[in-house]
Amino acid sequence: MTEPGLAPAPETAVDEVVGTAREALLGAPTLGAPEYLRFAEAVSEGAGRRWAEVAEANAQDVEDGRARGLSGPFLDRIRLEERHLELFGALSRSIARELPELVRPGPVVTGLGGLRARRVPKPLGVVFMIYEAKPTVTVEGALVAVCSGNATILRGSTEIAATNAVLADVLADALVESELPAGMVQVLGDTDRNQFRELLRRDDAVDLVIPRGSPSLVDYCRSATGIPVIVGGSGVNHLYVHESSDPELAVRLLLDSKLPEPAGCTALEMALVDEGAADAFFAVLAERAAAGDLLDLRLRVPEELIADLPEELVAAQPVEPLADHDDGREYLDLVLAVRVVDGVDEAVDHIRRHGSGHTEGIVSGSAEATERFCRRVDAAAVVVNGSLRLHDGPTMGLGAELAISTGRLHVRGPVTIDALVTHTWRIEGNGAVRFLD
């Protein structure tokens, strides 16, 4: 018997999963109906009521991951804390604020024979999300997709199976409380790869795929499906420190871009430091290291520079020689590479060769250097004199976010609720024809 809140087991045909989702869409209220607001509230309240169960299941997932030898940063991605419950409440409130604008029709345009046309928002349909670790995505994916009128199929990784089982029940209860069709959210209870692959082939029933995870997961989804994909891409991100920058500011931004969430998609992987800024930069970095501010951060620096680094830095932090394979690498760990470059052009050329097009940054006191960098760097976001972690939907004031897309079509940057809505043109013809008259 299938556990409450979980989708059918893998031996059940994928037809049942997609059929349930399509049927739910047919029975769902129109976009903007009050049931969607009630669902957002019910998810937040339900998570609060059952937080002890969620926390217990999550602790089991973390312990299982530790026993399997998962890294500390990866375990941090699995771990839920009280702040995440607060996040769910904030997400629900944010969606409530965004829905009126989301459902507002576009302006009326007048055409041939006095016809009147306007764009009317419509849900995309069935959204299939695949993600690794991060059980917060289970709640975020359900809230953003359902409140924009879509049915969603959620497939988390094995590492969060226990947490997802409880969250699936929370979501199922919220659908009942809000009187939405039960099939609007399906949390797959088994991470069977055959089921996953078959769902990617169902372009007749699934309208959008959103993968969040490793580059290999994202690349597989792109190559294995004919369904449109919003890519939550990997973050091989750089921070360029121009010679005109304040070294104190540069180091502060570097640390905030790396330490709080080293496995996050906006985490800094390599600092590109101007030759003219290197001495002051490393001196400040050494001061912060001596004060314990770098935590367990491991540095990778060109071998020829290691001997010239401040003694305090080498004494406080592990420093390893930088290798060619470190270029373009997403560490997903407390590892930071540093390269010294000869000006803006060399920094930009390095980013063009090795960046992933996610988030790039510059620390600079020169308007000319900043403008040159921003014009030449092609990424979903370019941050000027700020932490790379500012590239975040809620932080930017854009509202709830599902992922950060590195694609070029439909959406680039934060994937907010409006990215899950398409439009229908409503044309009032008033009897107009094109040719017969």
Cite the ranges covered by each PLM segment.
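N-terminal Rossmann-like NAD(P)+-binding subdomain of aldehyde/semialdehyde dehydrogenases
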Residues: 1-117, 144
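C-terminal core of ALDH-fold dehydrogenases
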Residues: 38-42, 344-437
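Solvent-exposed alpha-helices and their adjacent loops that cap or buttress functional pockets
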Residues: 109, 117-123, 146, 177-181, ...
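A structured beta-alpha segment of the ubiquitous adenosine-cofactor-binding alpha/beta core
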Residues: 81, 116-119, 187-203
